[in-house]
UniProtKB/Swiss-Prot annotation:
Coiled-coil residue spans: none
Organism phylogeny: Eukaryota, Metazoa, Chordata, Craniata, Vertebrata
PTM annotation, UniProt: Phosphorylated.
UniProtKB keywords: Congenital hypothyroidism, Disease variant, DNA-binding, Nucleus, Phosphoprotein, Transcription, Transcription regulation
Annotated organism of origin: Homo sapiens
CDD domains, alphabetized: FH_FOXE
Effect recorded for residue 65 to V: In BAMLAZ; loss of sequence-specific DNA binding; loss of transcriptional activity
Function, in words: Transcription factor that binds consensus sites on a variety of gene promoters and activate their transcription. Involved in proper palate formation, most probably through the expression of MSX1 and TGFB3 genes which are direct targets of this transcription factor. Also implicated in thyroid gland morphogenesis. May indirectly play a role in cell growth and migration through the regulation of WNT5A expression.
Name this protein carries in UniProt: Forkhead box protein E1
Annotated compartments: Nucleus
Family annotation (SMART domains): FH
DNA-binding among keywords: yes
Pfam family, one: Forkhead
């Protein structure tokens, strides 16, 4: 077919008629331009107000309810009651608006939360309008606010003052504390939360007795801390102050009351009682045998004595031993004569059999990790 045998092109008048018919059909289908919520420029229009809804914001409704209250404060239930009595729209519609009222009360600084008095019946706190926010609406009209109110200092508002009952309770608590701690002088409780308790003197407690550390010792002894005024036993007294701050033991001719402990790195003569430190010291290379007149060997931070076994005897068939302080007592544990070496292992002759048995059962070489072939 050629172009001449085809249908003729439509006339402009026919195209205009078709466009008008299509627009009428769309309008008859209920899709007008206003129903889409868009204007001629394509921008979305503001949602229209619901029929019968008051033109006041939730902040204005709350401020209106508080302003009409006799005491200029209301509970949350009182605010609900005022709004539903004054505006029937909120009485007939669902209660979703109550959530908005609660949110505006807690999120806006222009509303103050006042605790309920102790003797007042009912429940819930009171809500009041901040005194500095009374002029936030222009010319007393609740239709428009000047600007958002921001609270500067919480401690400057009288709404946060404690009531008389709370003040009396605080005074009673302060009196009770003064009776328990006579030396304490607590200041009056500040009326606002977050304030600093100034002027409080803590009770004067007796200081604990100081721990005795000799002057020449590079570090404190790891066995005991001695108080010079109170020796541990009648045989042991405060450490003598030797020349140059020496912390050595007293000589054999000194009285027993001048015997003291030997701190780290100190050596000296044996005390007057030869059986006061009858215990063996097992060092890294074995036990160190020491005679009755030899000096005491002391490792860093530990007390040691001669390597002789605990002195004692038998009296009437009962074996007696000498304890750490040189006092005689029945020896219930006579077999435990060895002590521990610095490595945490048992030393002495009594521990040799123990180590021999465990060395056979648990070899310490590499063969313990190789299975038998």
């Amino acid at each position: 077919m050629t172009a001449e045998s085809g249908p003729p092109p439509p006339q402009p008048e026919v195209l205009a008629t078709v466009k008008e018919e299509r627009g009428e059909t769309a309008a008859g289908a209920g899709v007008p331009g206003e129903a889409t919520g868009r204007g001629a420029g394509g921008r979305r229009r503001k949602r229209p107000l619901q029929r019968g809804k008051p033109p006041y914001s939730y902040i204005a409704l709350i401020a209106m309810a508080i302003a009409h209250a006799p005491e200029r404060r209301l509970t949350l239930g009182g605010i609900y009651k005022f709004i539903t009595e004054r505006f029937p729209f909120y009485r007939d519609n669902p209660k979703k608006w109550q959530n908005s009222i609660r949110h505006n009360l807690t999120l806006n600084d222009c509303f103050l939360k006042i605790p309920r008095e102790a003797g007042r019946p009912g429940k819930g706190n009171y809500w009041a309008l901040d005194p500095n926010a009374e002029d936030m609406f222009e010319s007393g009209s609740f239709l428009r606010r000047r600007k958002r109110f921001k609270r500067s200092d919480l401690s400057t508002y009288p709404a946060y003052m404690h009531d008389a009952a709370a003040a009396a309770a605080a005074a009673a608590a302060a009196a009770a504390a003064a009776a328990i701690f006579p030396g304490a002088v607590p200041a009056a409780r500040p009326p606002y939360p977050g304030a600093v308790y100034a002027g409080y003197a803590p009770p004067s407690l007796a200081a604990p007795p100081p721990v005795y550390y000799p002057a020449a010792s590079p570090g404190p002894c790891r066995v005991f801390g001695l108080v010079p005024e109170r020796p541990l036993s009648p045989e042991l007294g405060p450490a003598p102050s030797g020349p140059g701050g020496s912390c050595a033991f007293a000589s054999a001719g000194a009285p027993a009351t001048t015997t003291g402990y030997q701190p780290a790195g100190c050596t000296g003569a044996r005390p007057a009682n030869p059986s006061a430190y009858a215990a063996a010291y097992a060092g890294p290379d074995g036990a160190y045998p020491q005679g009755a007149g030899s000096a005491i060997f002391a490792a860093a931070g530990r007390l040691a004595g001669p390597a002789s076994p605990p002195a004692g005897g038998s009296s009437g068939g009962v074996e007696t031993t000498v304890d750490f302080y040189g006092r005689t007592s029945p020896g219930q544990f006579g077999a435990l004569g060895a002590c521990y070496n610095p490595g945490g292992q048992l030393g002495g002759a009594s521990a040799g059999a123990y180590h021999a048995r465990h060395a056979a059962a648990y070899p310490g070489g590499i063969d313990r990790f190789v299975s038998a072939m």
